[in-house]
Amino acid sequence: MLDRRTLMGGILSMAGSKATGAALPGRRLRVFVATLGTETNSFSPLPTGLDAFRATMLWRPGEHPDFATEATGPLWAARERAREGRYEVIEGTCAFAMPGGPVSAQAYQLLRDEILDQLRRAMPVDIVAFGLHGAMLAFGEDECEADLLERARAIVGPDVALGAELDLHAHLSQRLVRAADVLVAFKYYPHIDYVERARDLLDLLERIRAGEIMPTSSLFNCQMVAGLATQSSPMKELVADLFEFERRGEVLSGSLIQGFRAGDVARMGSKVLIYTNNDQPAAASIAQDFGRRYQAMASIMKGNGPERSFAADIELAKAATAYPVILVDSSDNPGGGASGDNMALARAMLDNDLVPSCIGPIWDPLAVQLGFEAGLGADFSLRVGGKVGEASGLPLDVRGKITGLAENVTQNLQGSRPPLGRVVCISTAGLDIIVSEIRDQCYGPDMFRALGVEPANKRYVAVKSSEQWRIGFGDMGRSVIYVASSQQSSIRHYHKRSRPMWPFEPV
């Protein structure tokens, strides 16, 4: 059966067609933008309901603050063009939750339908652009993004240009690709390019609406899942080559989707998505070429071959001679849906005299409350962490001093300010433990500095993160050691993911 793009081919090539209406001189494009997303960890004990969205992002039309966020790049880019007189922007709800467990059916349906009702009221429009993540799962719906896009298409019809920006840790499927005219994912990890990719998305949607291009896609399944930083070789060169294909015009858009291994769904995995201008054989060939190169490099990259034991990680840290050493507790990263309250690394730092040092953020609202009750300077016994679930492990009983208290602490994330709420620093035996009221990962040193702790003066700096910490720390660390404190991979039991998939099975 011919898909919508094939049927549109004749229409797009006709002079004076309806699609060319977007290019009429003097007319601003009517553009609807909204956001709905989270990154769902199927194994997280943390429920994701409406309160989780309220705690992170639940901005109704007109409430989006005057800065860009990872989740709302399309809205920000559309506002830029509205200021230039090019767009009439109709803003929908922007909703995003800190990664956790599956979204409740009630929360997902309420937010989805709220956005779709806003779209109905906005009609007629020329363009619909969503900020999505790509790895959002809800009870009763394993493909939230495709579901939203399909329902949006039913509202706007075939002639409106419809697309979305995705995180590169998305789960891609043919259903999701078919649901949009074009999908554009971040190219960098850490995620530093969400505004640029949102601009790319809008450029493509404008050209689609004007009838200038007909994106034709190919999706290559790498049969693996590998999270690779893009600032170092060989991934750096692969991304650069993809940009070069786009610059030359051979590719309209290309996305290297790394996938998210904590999502237990059939579509989970690393994939390559390529769009060409009505040239499917070329799209398939280019997607396969990049996919094969990605497969070849994965096994030599961090975190994708045989993992060191936690004990070996600590021995490696003890052997360091250049400081500070950044200890990255990626297995307990709140940015991947973990609780952020596993204390194994903090305990090991104390037991092995890895001091002077600091660690954070540890998520423990009760410990924060008790720390504020005790007050600044108090000598205090406090049980920290180990509260949420099996992966949290044992709590750490700390006898120390409250050396820092701060309210309304935020972190700088490329201009946006994700909150940590009230934060406590408890110092014991040379280790400064940063405990936060709101769960989030570490994006940089300002989290420590808000409590009077200077990471540059420490021998060891332990962060609850995976790669996003690099945004703020830059090259502060003389060496970087990735540790696996919670051993979460050992307690994951997949039921839905495809098989075989490397590194779980040989391919």
Swiss-Prot record:
Pfam families per the record?
DUF1485, MlrC_C
Q: What keywords would UniProt list here? A: Hydrolase, Metal-binding, Metalloprotease, Protease, Signal, Zinc
Q: How is the cofactor bound?
A: Binds 1 zinc ion per subunit.
As cofactor, the record names: Zn(2+)
Please give the InterPro entries that the UniProt record associates with this protein: MlrC, MlrC_C, MlrC_N
* Entry function: Involved in peptidolytic degradation of cyclic heptapeptide hepatotoxin microcystin (MC). Cleaves both linear MC and the tetrapeptide degradation product of MC. Cleaves the Adda-Glu peptide bond of linear MC heptapeptides.
Q: Report the protein name in the record.
A: Microcystinase C
